[in-house]
């Protein structure tokens, strides 16, 4: 870490005593735990332009949510930009990802308990009153299609231009928008004491289509009837159809 960045961090969170890379690293940024005289913090850093934009968006979302205390997310402490990299500082939260918790679970009974907790946690988010200032200026799906088109033009998406055209022309019937996470996979929620308790990677939090969250939430166990039933014991609002699941998980998510 260069001296300038270290100095900027210490202005926000106090003198740094220790810094270490986390065992679990995301695909879009480098994540470090920092211990200072004021406590434990998380530093996310990225040098890729697309992911720097996501970090900036996450900083704006966390800042608003820290001010309102409306959703279970890390506390925002600051955003730092350098010429070739961006950094966001937030509270370090105890817990492991649901992906890790499911991997470490001793049997299906424990896994089903975790998955039911995930369903309950997501259900609460989708029942939460919309948070001002982090709602998209246009329809959520219109915005995602537009962003996907930008990524295709820049060669930054796995999805093709043909797929995007299909998604644009064959949209699902609109539903009432709710607060959504926007990337609600098992990688992006934390588990503590056997319960899902916190959202991480908050860049996509806004008003949007709850079926997108639901589809990404079940993507890793969509063909396991017992696990799927456990999820819907907790998530009681709606059950996506096969066509809706394919649209959001097998289609739209290809671009993000």
Model-derived regions: residue spans:
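An alpha-helical support segment within catalytic cores of ATP-dependent transferases
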Residues: 2-11, 104, 109-118, 123-182
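ATP-binding glycine-rich phosphate-binding loop
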Residues: 13-36
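Active-site acidic catalytic loop and adjacent metal/ATP-binding pocket
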Residues: 27-35, 42-43, 166-212
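Generic structural signal for small/hydrophobic residues in well-ordered secondary structure
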Residues: 31, 62, 76, 91, ...
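A conserved alpha-helical element in kinase catalytic cores
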Residues: 42-88, 105-124
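Active-site Asp-x-Gly
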Residues: 52, 178-179, 192-240, 246, ...
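Protein kinase-like catalytic domain
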Residues: 66, 122-130, 222, 235-239
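Short pocket-lining segment of the protein kinase catalytic domain that shapes the ATP-binding cleft
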Residues: 88-96
